[in-house]
From Swiss-Prot:
Coiled-coil regions listed in the entry: 269-353, 380-421
Originating gene: PBXIP1
Domain remark in the UniProt entry: The C-terminal domain (AA 443-731) contains a nuclear export signal. Association to the cytoskeleton through a N-terminal leucine rich-domain (AA 190-218).
Subcellular localization: Cytoplasm, Cytoskeleton; Nucleus
Lineage start: Eukaryota, Metazoa, Chordata, Craniata, Vertebrata
Record's compositionally biased regions (Polar residues): 1-10, 61-70
Protein name per its UniProtKB record: Pre-B-cell leukemia transcription factor-interacting protein 1
Entry's Gene Ontology BP terms: regulation of DNA-templated transcription
GO MF term list: transcription coregulator activity
Record PTM Phosphoserine, positions in chain: S43, S130, S134, S147, S148, S149
Description of how the protein assembles with itself and partners: Interacts with ESR1, PBX1, PBX2 and PBX3. Interacts with TEX11.
GO cellular component, one term: microtubule
Composition skew (Basic and acidic residues), residue ranges: 498-544, 551-568, 716-727
């Protein structure tokens, strides 16, 4: 059986067993007034909770009200009905403990079943459900009147059980119940809507923060910062819904605070991004400044290169001009010697041993015959010696030409190397190319001239007019001319064998010079130019009136010259040459102490204290005491007031001490050559003096004065002796 739809009591199926019908009265503990009292306004959440509780207890409340209204009627009907049941079925017993437990289970079950009609009443809000229970009471009365029939009673009561109801209270109007249900429904719906809106708002806020964190960094690098504010702010529609749903001032204030926090976050991040960007730009500016400085230094170095090339071009041009002048002089000398030799060979009839036995015909034949005597005697030994001398001169000139050719070839190689090293478009390149072209032409001219020598006729005639036989003690005009050109050439003319040996040694020296040039990586034409300058200065130097002796090589090989020189001239003072030396005054300083300090720092990297006369005199005596031939030099030292002041201090402000020591060494070398024929004994003079004033370590820092001095010194007989000793 199913429950009756018009009954306020909940009827449930009891199962297949025949359960007794029990009518329960109102509960004594319930207060009808407390149930009918108006409820205070509550929050939406509490109203929803009470609504659910009311839904569960709805059936009980209605049944209690109905039972309270029809209390006397039900009591009468129950007694009548009980009597009928007892009369009809005397075997039915009162419920026992098992029935009580089953009754408890059934009491819990109708509560679940009774939720459905109560919830349907709330949703439909039908007013007839909340009306008074008078129809129900009538239905119960009709049921009680018809209960006299056994069949009807069995049909109506079998398997049914009535729930316990509450005490009936004051009935409420239907309109009041409908309004309360509607308010409760709206409260629950409003609370649900507010919670959904808050969830949507929270999700939008989280979404905005995510976009700000992950999208704001990438957009800050591209530049626009306004888009970050647009992405972070919530949608306008969502704000409107939030305000309409909440309807509370506190929620609006909270929303404003949230928006302010969201607005402040991107501003801080934008400031951090701007600071990072400024730091990067500052670093880039520093890098650009460093690059500009490097480019500036490179441009300055490139601008200084043409100046160096111009200086090198000028040096090479001067060396070329000197080589050309020396070549022209040698060519003229060689032509004269060839003409003289051919004239002698033409006028002389040679014998089996190669000697001139008879003079030929010619204008000079009579003169020769007169000089030799009317008997036609053989030529004197002086003539033969002069002939050999001329042959030696010719051979020496050939060797000198070959030497000049090799020197010009080395200069040409240096020029070609310079042209290769110089860059294209350099203004000095044209001058270097012109010098190389001129050198190549000179080399070809020398080769052609050596193969096809020209012999002018007037030269031989002029030579035949000169006397051929002169005293050995009186030098001939040719010898005087050679003395004006330079005493160093006579060594070649006198001794052919020694000339060839010296040529070999010179070749070895030249090879060493070439190796040095390759190691240094730059041309050393100035060395060759220094040699040529020395030769020209010696050749242009007039004969000295003081009668300075010839070099040691000529004195050793030809004692007659030495004897003649001693007979004709008085010996020079040992230190006389030192006073003729021209010194250059130091520049950029004033005062003895300042100039001495500047000189020491410039040449040795160490400050030089003013040199005292007594200290230098002691050093000179110590050095000269080691030389056996230097005894007379110690008697009168070259320490005149021209070099030292009244206080005995060297005049550093008038001449450099370094130049003074160089002059002393040159004078000692000349004296050594005159005494021993060798100048190697005094090569360590400078090192001895400078090591005392500066120390041994300072000698390594010298600016190359020794090499320059050797270049200027390698002229004359010493130029030939030094390589010969090394070889």
């Amino acid at each position: 059986m199913a429950s009756c739809p018009d009954s306020d009591n909940s009827w449930v199926l009891a199962g297949s067993e025949s359960l007794p019908v029990e009518t329960l009265g109102p509960e004594s503990g319930n207060d009808p007034e407390s149930e009918r009292a108006p409820r205070a306004p509550q929050s939406p959440s509490r109203a929803a909770a009470e609504e659910s509780a009311g839904t569960l207890d709805g059936g009980e409340t209605v049944s209690q009200n109905e039972s309270s209204k029809s209390g006397p009627i039900l009591s009468e009907e129950a007694e009548a009905k009980q009597g009928v049941l007892e009369g009809d079925d005397p075997g039915v017993e009162s419920p026992g403990p098992g029935d009580t437990e089953a009754q408890g289970d059934l009491e819990e079950t109708p509560e679940v079943v009774g939720l459905e009609p109560d919830s349907q009443d709330l949703e439909d809000q039908s007013p007839h459900r909340s009306l008074p229970s008078s129809p129900k009471t009538a239905w119960i009365r009709e049921e009680a009147h018809h209960s006299s029939s056994d069949d009807d009673t069995d049909v109506d009561v079998e398997g049914l059980r009535r729930r316990r109801g509450r005490e009936p209270g004051t009935p409420q109007p239907a309109a009041t119940l409908g309004v309360e249900d509607q308010v409760q429904g709206e409260g629950a719906g409003g609370q649900l809507g507010i919670s959904l809106n808050m969830c949507l708002l929270g999700s939008l806020v989280l979404l905005g923060l995510g976009v700000l964190l992950f999208g704001g960094l990438s957009e800050s690098e591209s530049g626009p910062l306004e888009e970050v504010d647009l992405q972070v702010l919530p949608d306008v529609e969502s704000d409107t819904e939030m305000l309409e749903a909440v309807g509370d001032g506190q929620d609006g204030l909270q929303q404003l605070q949230t928006s302010e926090v969201l607005d402040s976050v991107p501003s801080l991040q934008n400031m951090a991004l701007l600071l990072d960007k400024l730091a990067k730009e500052n670093q880039d500016i520093r890098l650009l400044q460093a690059q500009l400085q490097a480019q500036k230094e490179e441009l300055q170095s490139l601008m200084r290169q043409p100046k160096g090339l111009e200086e090198e071009n000028a040096r090479l041009r001067g060396a070329l001009q000197q080589g050309e002048a020396s070549q022209r002089a040698l060519e003229s000398e060689l032509q004269q010697l060839r003409a003289q030799l051919q004239g002698l060979e033409a006028d002389c009839v040679q014998g089996a041993d190669g000697l001139c036995l008879q003079w030929g015909r010619g204008p000079q034949a009579g003169q020769v015959t007169k000089e030799q005597g009317p008997t036609g005697q053989e030529p004197s030994p002086g003539f033969l010696e002069q002939k050999k001398q001329l042959e030696a001169e010719a051979q020496a000139l050939r060797q000198e030409l070959e030497r000049q050719r090799r020197l010009l070839g080395s200069v040409q190689q240096d020029l070609e190397r310079s042209l290769k090293e110089a860059g294209r478009g350099d203004p000095a390149r044209a001058g270097l190319a012109e010098l190389g072209h001129r050198l190549a032409q000179k080399l070809r001219g020398l080769e052609n001239w050596g193969q096809h020598p020209g012999v002018p006729a007037n030269v031989s005639e002029a030579w035949h007019q000169k006397p051929h036989f002169q005293n050995s003690r009186e030098p001939s005009g040719k010898e005087k001319w050679w003395d004006r050109q330079g005493d160093w050439k006579t060594e070649h003319w006198k001794h052919k064998k020694e000339a060839s040996g010296r040529e070999k040694s010179w070749r070895g020296e030249e090879d060493r010079e070439l190796v040095g040039r390759r190691k240094e990586g730059k041309p050393r034409v100035e060395e060759w130019a220094g040699k040529k300058d020395g030769k020209q200065q010696r050749s242009k130097e007039p004969p000295r009136k003081s009668g300075r002796p010839h070099p040691s090589g000529e004195r050793q090989k030809h004692p007659r010259w030495k004897e003649g020189a001693k007979d004709r001239h008085d010996p020079l003072p040992l230190w006389a040459e030192l006073s003729r030396h021209k010194y250059q005054a130091p520049q950029g300083c004033s005062g003895v102490h300042e100039c001495a300090r500047q000189e020491g720092l410039a040449f040795f990297g160490i400050e030089l204290a003013p040199v005292r006369q007594q200290e230098l005199a002691s050093l000179l005596r110590t050095y000269l005491a080691r030389l056996p031939w230097a005894g007379p030099l110690t008697e009168e030292l070259p320490l005149s007031p021209a070099y030292f002041g009244e206080d005995g201090i060297f005049r550093h402000d008038r001449l450099r001490f370094r130049d003074f020591v160089d002059a002393l060494e040159d004078q000692l070398e000349e004296v050594a050559v005159r005494q021993t024929g060798d100048d190697d004994a005094v090569d360590d003079f400078e090192d001895f003096i400078f090591s005392h004033f500066f120390g041994d370590k300072a000698l390594k820092k010298r600016s190359g004065k020794k090499d320059k001095h050797l270049q200027n010194r390698v002229v004359g007989p010493r130029e030939e002796h030094s390589p010969h000793r090394q070889g």
